[in-house]
Structure formats: C-alpha cells, structure tokens
C-alpha cells in the first residue's frame, strides 16, 4: 500500500505543479504550489527519502513566508518577513552543500535559487514568469536523475511559459501593428 500511496502523492504533486500557473492571484498561485509541495513531502517520506523530504519541507516553509511578502515597503511586518525569508534560505543552502551529488545537484540548486527568487516577487506576472523559468534547470535535473514525472512537469512548465510569452507578444495588439527591432512599432498596411 505504501508504494501506491507514495506514487499517488507524487502524481498529485505533479498535477498541482502543472496547475498553479493558471491561478490569477499570487496568493492563489502560492497556495496551489504549497499543496503540490505537501504532496511531494508525503511522496518523499513514504519512499524513505529523508533528504528530499527535508528540502521539500524547507521550501514549503519559504513558500508559506512568501504569502506575507505583500505590503507597504516601510511596514515593520514586511521587514520582519523579508528577514525571515532570507534567513530561511540558509538551511536550504546548507542542506544543498551537505548532500551535493554533482551535476544533478548543480541543476537542482539553480532551479531552487530561481524558484526562491520568483517567490520573492510580489507582482503576479513576474512571480509566474520567474517560477516558470525555473523549469529549465529542473528539467535538466529531472532528466539526469531519470524522473519521468519530473520531466513531464518541467516540460509542461516550459510549454506554459512559451504559451504565455507568445500570448503576451502576439495576441492583443491592434491589427496592422507589429513590433520591430528594438521594440519600435511599425505600421503595416492591411488590404
């Protein structure tokens, strides 16, 4: 029963990792990401993978802190949350160094840094874009360790990023206007 539950939580986590980017608000994105992290935490615990479970728990805590990064820049509460967020990165860095396993760890570390930077962003579009960009190093990590669900999730993230980029660039502009080099708009005659 435990292997089945472990896999079920793993696939549920993968599904949530695919769905978070469809949320409209940053807090909803974070809540869905946290749901995915909770599923992966159970997945790793049931498989007896202590290091992965510990890292997932640490990153789940960072995501929870991210919920409180909104607010007035001069707010004492916001300053405290920012300090706690930065302090929470230290155990992540220490665990990464202590369990280093070569090239896969390198790509996991880059993916983690990009993800943590993305969760620091309070603008929903920037938050989404940076976190989707973290799919690149995570895809390389997943491929190196042979994680098929990880590869599928990361490819979905890259596809979602490409779709959102294309949608932003090419949809919603008036007919007859195309962006030229350097961002200058040139009018094209439409017959």
Language-model regions: role of each:
Residues 1-191:
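Alpha-helical membrane-protein topology signature
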